[in-house]
C-alpha cells in the first residue's frame, strides 16, 4: 500500500511543489494542497481531515513576503505554510512532518534550534532541491518499518494482543505440551500458530468473518491446559485442527492453531469516531485508513513475534485473507 504525503506551499510556488511530486515518484501517493480542499467545506476542516489521512507531510517555506520588523526588511514564508506545518506537526509528530525552507527565508523564532532542511534553487549544489527531497525519501524508507502510537489504535492493539494472547498461548503449550478439548487433554508433539488478518473489516468487525472461517476450515475450539493445583489459572481459548486430521489423538499429535484477533473489531469503531460520515456508500478515505491500520497491526505483530524465542518460528501472520 502506497503511503500518502500531503504537500503544502504558497500559491506562488506550485512549480516547486510539482517538482517535488515528480522527485518523489510513484512509490508514494502525493496529495498537493491544491487537491486537498473539498467543496462546501472550510479550508480548516479540509486541512484537519488531511492530517488524519496523510501518513507524512512536506511543507515548503519560500521567500514569498517582504516584511519590516524593527526597521529591518525580512523575507518570510506565507503565513498559511507556517500554520499548516504546525497543524501537521501536532497531529503526526516530528518524525512524519517535514519543513523545507528556501535559503535566507526568515522562519519563526519558535523553530530556532531545530534542524530545518534549507534548499537552493541552484542545481548542482549540496542542498539543491533534488538532494533535499532524496534525503527525505531515504528517511521515509527508514521509518516505514517502524510503528508509532497514533490517534488510531492498531499499534496498541497489536501489543496488547501479542502480550495477552499469542505469547501466553505459546508459553503454555511449550510448558505443558498439551491442549484441552472438551475436557480431554491431548498431548502435543509440535504446534504452529497462524494469525489470520482479514483483507477487510465489515460493520461487525471480524465477528462474522471468524464464524464463517472456522466453519469453512472445520476448526475445533480448545484451550491451553490448566493445572487444578494452581488457583486462578485459566485456559486460553483458540481454534485449531490436527495435522493430519485422522491422526490418533491417543498419541502426541501435531496441531495447527488459527486465530482471528477479535481485537481488530476495535478498529471499526475507532474509525467511525475518527472520520465520521453521514453518507451511505463507499468511502475511499475510510477504506484507506482501514487498510493502513490492518497493515500496521500485522507489522507490529510480526516484529514482536520475531523478538521472543517462545513465538519466533512458531507463529506466522497471514495478511489480506479472503473467505
Curated annotation (Swiss-Prot):
It comes from Sphingobacterium faecium (strain DSM 11690 / JCM 21820 / NBRC 15299 / NCIMB 13408 / KS 0470). The keyword RNA-binding does not apply. Forms homodimers which subsequently form filaments. In vitro in the presence of c-di-GMP forms filaments up to 300 nm in length with an ordered array of parallel-stacked subunits, where the TIR domains form one face of the filament and the STING domains form the other face. Antiparallel double-filament structures are also seen. 3'3'-cGAMP weakly induces filament formation, while 2'3'-cGAMP does not. Changing residue 290 to K: No NAD(+) cleavage, binds c-di-GMP, does not form filaments. Changing residue 307 to E: No NAD(+) cleavage, binds c-di-GMP, does not form filaments. Keywords: Antiviral defense, Hydrolase, Nucleotide-binding. Residues 4-120 form the TIR domain. Transmembrane segments: none annotated. In the C-terminal section; belongs to the bacterial STING family. Effector protein of a CBASS antiviral system with NAD(+) hydrolase activity. CBASS (cyclic oligonucleotide-based antiphage signaling system) provides immunity against bacteriophage. The CD-NTase protein synthesizes cyclic nucleotides in response to infection; these serve as specific second messenger signals. The signals activate a diverse range of effectors, leading to bacterial cell death and thus abortive phage infection. A type I-D(GG) CBASS system. Residues 154-323 are annotated as: STING domain. This is CD-NTase-associated protein 12. Changing residue 234 to A: No NAD(+) cleavage. Changing residue 262 to A: Requires 100X more c-di-GMP for activation. 3',3'-c-di-GMP binds at residues 164-165, 234, 237, 259, 262-263. Its EC number is 3.2.2.5. The active site is at 84. Pfam families: CAP12-PCTIR_TIR, prok_STING. GO terms for molecular function: NAD+ nucleosidase activity; NADP+ nucleosidase activity; nucleotide binding. Changing residue 95 to Q: 10-fold decrease of NAD(+) cleavage, binds c-di-GMP, still forms filaments, inhibits growth in E.coli. GO terms for biological process: defense response to virus. Changing residue 168 to A: Requires 100X more c-di-GMP for activation. Changing residue 208 to D: 100-fold decrease of NAD(+) cleavage, binds c-di-GMP, forms some filaments. Changing residue 167 to A: About wild-type activation by c-di-GMP.
Amino acid at each position: 500500500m502506497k503511503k500518502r504525503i500531503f504537500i503544502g506551499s504558497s500559491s506562488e510556488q506550485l512549480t516547486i511543489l510539482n517538482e517535488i511530486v515528480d522527485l518523489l515518484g510513484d512509490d508514494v501517493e502525493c496529495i498537493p494542497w491544491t487537491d486537498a480542499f473539498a467543496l462546501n467545506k472550510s479550508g480548516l476542516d479540509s486541512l484537519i481531515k488531511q492530517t488524519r489521512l496523510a501518513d507524512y507531510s512536506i511543507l515548503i517555506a519560500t521567500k514569498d513576503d517582504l516584511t519590516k520588523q524593527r526597521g529591518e526588511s525580512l523575507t518570510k514564508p506565507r503565513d498559511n505554510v507556517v500554520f499548516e506545518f504546525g497543524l501537521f506537526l501536532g497531529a503526526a509528530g516530528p518524525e512524519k512532518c517535514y519543513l523545507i525552507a528556501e535559503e535566507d527565508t526568515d522562519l519563526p523564532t519558535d523553530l530556532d534550534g531545530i534542524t530545518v532542511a534549507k534548499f537552493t534553487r541552484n542545481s548542482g549544489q549540496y542542498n539543491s532541491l533534488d538532494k533535499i527531497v532524496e534525503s527525505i525519501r531515504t528517511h521515509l524508507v527508514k521509518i516505514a518499518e517502524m510503528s508509532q502510537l497514533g490517534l488510531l489504535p492498531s499499534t496498541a492493539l497489536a501489543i496488547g494482543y501479542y502480550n495477552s494472547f499469542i505469547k501466553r498461548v505459546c508459553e503454555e503449550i511449550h510448558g505443558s505440551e498439551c491442549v484441552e478439548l472438551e475436557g480431554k487433554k491431548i498431548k502435543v508433539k509440535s504446534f504452529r500458530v497462524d494469525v489470520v488478518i482479514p483483507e477487510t473489516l465489515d460493520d461487525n468487525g471480524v465477528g462474522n468473518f471468524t464464524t464463517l472461517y472456522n466453519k469453512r476450515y472445520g476448526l475445533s475450539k480448545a484451550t491451553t491446559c490448566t493445572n487444578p493445583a494452581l488457583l486462578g489459572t485459566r485456559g486460553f481459548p483458540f481454534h485449531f485442527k490436527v495435522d493430519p486430521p485422522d491422526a490418533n489423538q491417543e498419541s502426541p499429535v501435531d496441531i495447527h492453531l488459527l486465530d482471528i484477533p477479535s481485537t481488530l473489531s476495535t478498529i471499526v469503531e475507532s474509525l467511525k469516531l475518527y472520520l465520521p460520515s453521514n453518507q451511505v456508500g463507499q468511502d475511499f478515505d475510510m477504506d484507506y485508513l482501514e487498510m493502513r491500520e490492518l497493515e500496521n497491526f500485522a507489522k507490529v505483530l510480526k516484529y514482536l513475534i520475531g523478538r521472543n524465542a517462545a513465538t519466533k518460528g512458531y507463529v506466522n501472520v497471514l495478511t489480506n485473507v479472503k473467505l
